[in-house]
Amino acid sequence: MKITILGAGSFGTAIAIALSSISTSINLWGRNHTDMQSITINRKNLKYLPTYELPDNIIPSSSIDEVLSDHNTCIILAVPTQQLRTLCLYVQQHIFEQTPLLICSKGIENISLKFPSEIVKEILPNNPTYILSGPSFAKEIAANLPCTIVLAGENEVLGTSLINKMSNKTFKIVYSKDTLGVQIGAALKNIIAIACGIITGKNLGNNAVASVIAKGMEEIKTLYTAKNETINLSTLIGPSCLGDLILTCTTTHSRNMSFGVAIGQGEDINKMLNKKSEIIEGVSTVKPLISLAEKLNIELPICTSIYNLLYKNVSLDKTISEIL
């Protein structure tokens, strides 16, 4: 089995390590030639996962021709949502039709207000598209610690075949047809995590955090209902919604929650954003989310409060009172 991962950040690298035990060859592609040379020489991604060594069957490369010249069992797209369209356009002429595409991006695209699967299907309509999502910190995946994530897509036969090929004892994948529900949970949980981080940073207690998580789940349900009349309960209470929401909202290993904690402790938001080397998905998602909510005529109180804090200069005290 041959797999290509497009995106050599922390998650793309971790997935490569996790799948190295069941794949004969894994291409790990990144656009930055210097970074990929460093990974090749050091056998570590010093920029994002510096303590984890890459097995020998992971082949780092910055050449898209090189990694996509042959047929792949699947191609994993592991870039932030706001970079996904650019990536798809860049590789459009290189990807073989009918090669399954597994999308790890979480969020909503600016301007178009599209979810990741909608972006990919627009540009690469002849490739089966799946969402790979769930509670999965990159460092824990790279350390071979157990996790369960979801593969969501329309073709159950192909999806099940991919799951059988890619799952192992610690990296478990379950199937879902609910592509939309999985993506809604993945998008909103990062914003809710910022809110939970603020509450934690202000030392307002675990009860308050639990309350915000519950309210956040209601906002996921509100958007889900507005986009799709039929709610799949197993999605809401499964790994990709409830599971990922709990994980992201309850530990500072989450970039989104730790960002919120820093805000709660009085750090300057703009200074933090300028210093961050990795994208805070909740920050980049909240603006298109609020535009989508206005378009759908729905109210998402917590997400709106975080948007107003980040982009409308609403005070922290007012934000906290609204969140609670």
Swiss-Prot record:
Q: Which UniProt keywords apply?
A: Cytoplasm, Lipid biosynthesis, Lipid metabolism, NAD, NADP, Nucleotide-binding, Oxidoreductase, Phospholipid biosynthesis, Phospholipid metabolism
Q: Tell me the pathway.
A: Membrane lipid metabolism; glycerophospholipid metabolism
Please tell me where NADPH binds in this chain: S10, F11, R31, K106, A138, R255, I279, E281
What is the similarity comment for this entry?
Answer: Belongs to the NAD-dependent glycerol-3-phosphate dehydrogenase family.
The organism is Ehrlichia canis (strain Jake)
Which residues act catalytically here?
Answer: K189 (proton acceptor)
> What is its subcellular localisation?
Cytoplasm
Know the name of this protein?
Glycerol-3-phosphate dehydrogenase [NAD(P)+]
Q: InterPro entries, from UniProt?
A: 6-PGluconate_DH-like_C_sf (IPR008927), 6PGD_dom2 (IPR013328), G3P_DH_NAD-dep (IPR006168), G3P_DH_NAD-dep_C (IPR006109), G3P_DH_NAD-dep_N (IPR011128), NAD(P)-bd_dom_sf (IPR036291)
**Where is sn-glycerol 3-phosphate bound in this sequence?**
K106, G134, S136, K189, D244, S254, R255, N256
Q: Tell me a Gene Ontology molecular-function term this record carries.
A: NAD binding
- HAMAP family assigned: NAD_Glyc3P_dehydrog
Q: Which GO terms describe its biological process?
A: carbohydrate metabolic process; glycerol-3-phosphate biosynthetic process; glycerol-3-phosphate catabolic process; glycerophospholipid metabolic process; phospholipid biosynthetic process
Q: Which Pfam families match?
A: NAD_Gly3P_dh_C, NAD_Gly3P_dh_N
Which cellular component, as a GO term, is one annotated location? cytosol
Reactions catalysed according to its record: sn-glycerol 3-phosphate + NAD(+) = dihydroxyacetone phosphate + NADH + H(+); sn-glycerol 3-phosphate + NADP(+) = dihydroxyacetone phosphate + NADPH + H(+)
Q: What is its EC number?
A: 1.1.1.94
Instruction: Provide the function of this protein.
Output: Catalyzes the reduction of the glycolytic intermediate dihydroxyacetone phosphate (DHAP) to sn-glycerol 3-phosphate (G3P), the key precursor for phospholipid synthesis.
Gene coding for it: gpsA
**Mainly localized where?**
cytoplasm
